[in-house]
Amino acid sequence: MKSEDAEPRKEEKPTQKEETKALREWLVGQQQAIRTAGMPIIVLVEGWAAAGKGSLINELISEIDPRFYNVVSPVITPEADARYPFLYPYAKAIPENGKIMFYDSGWMEDTVRKYLRREITKEQYKARIRSVNEFERQLRDGGYLLLKLFLDIGRGEQRKRMNALRESFETEWRVSADDLWQQREYDAFKETYRGFMEKTGKAIPWHTLDGGDRKEAVHDALQLLVDLLQKAMEKGRYVGKPFQESFPLLHMKKLSEVDLSPALTDEEYKTELKKLQKKLGKLHNVIYRKKIPVILCYEGWDAAGKGGNIRRIAKPLDPRGFDVMPIASPEPHELNRQYLWRFWTRLPRSGHICIFDRTWYGRVMVERLEGFCAENDWKRAYNEINEFERQLTEWGAVVLKFWIHIDQETQLARFNDRQNTPEKQWKLTDEDWRNREKWPLYEAAVDEMLAKTSTKNAPWFIIESNDKKYARIRTLQIVIDALEKACEAH
């Protein structure tokens, strides 16, 4: 019989096991809501070798629909990927809207190991830190949810786990030479890991989990992921505000100030074209041998002559060493990712040339003027593009950007010529005529683009193209001059 004076029974707290089960059930139950909301989620799992990163990811995905997530291990970089920029394997793996991507180690592990092996210098290490902060911030500002976890274990525990793995023929392969090196250099890794997290944890924090207690690590990781998702579902998709970093910008003329009268005779054109193409062909062999990547970006008015200009650049090149990337309206799977993704995935390998016919600058022109992105998005893009191009030039790429320029009268004459010539009619679309009506708006957008994104290392060149022959020769001269300087510097 219960005494009236007895204290009321305290409600028992759920056990860790019960909490973990509830968190997992919530995550499973919200899959469709996350997909419908179009939330792209990245879970980066870093940590010590043998800390249980793979096991943790396996626990996190155990009840999730396999169509809803992917797991990648980009730290194991294939030789082919090693010929791309540092962030390439991570950027190309970002998920589509409404899906989760789990990275089994990533930009932290790759950077720390290369730094401690002295494969990158202190200055390169600093540049990587900056690039990581830019990359993470761009993802966040574009609506991505990013959870960064670090699994921590002590030196003794790591040694114990490695020894256990090495004792069995079935598991010894899981302990690599790099892992054993990390065990020997535990203190150096610990200090460098700490420094990396301090330098990259301000905008998007790191969360350290106790890898010594696997059940607790799973519980805490699920709790952090659920908290992140609940907050996002409550507040809606994050949209970053624009800001402008101080880049070394070059002074650019406004389009209205450009003299479009330069022209060449047929004889001058033929002589120069033959000489310059021969020189470019030889330079292509040198940049291939020296593994210098080259990125040529073409923008310009409709009918300005981009295609013909590109053909004169491409003709003397070895077809095995270059690509031309025509950029049209983004496909659905491209629209479902951060806008730079489709350009990250088209970058050339070192030693190769990539010619972009239209580029990432569509963000601040057609997408801006046609309302395909919000005002904050295109205003933020100037800085994001400068950061992207700085990462390319720090990788070693030669980046040249050409605005192929004509006046309105020349464009109208070329439009009429296309319309009246059957074999050219395919080049002219209704959209070309609509864009022509918006010439003043586009001109203002281009002037702003040139002023805000022509940097010392990735300059813009306005190519006078009322005379196509002159435009082709001038572009060839600029490309050859830049490649000669790059070859001399290597």
Language-model features, listed with the residues they occupy:
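Glycine-rich phosphate-binding loop of ATP-dependent small-molecule kinases
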Residues: 1-490
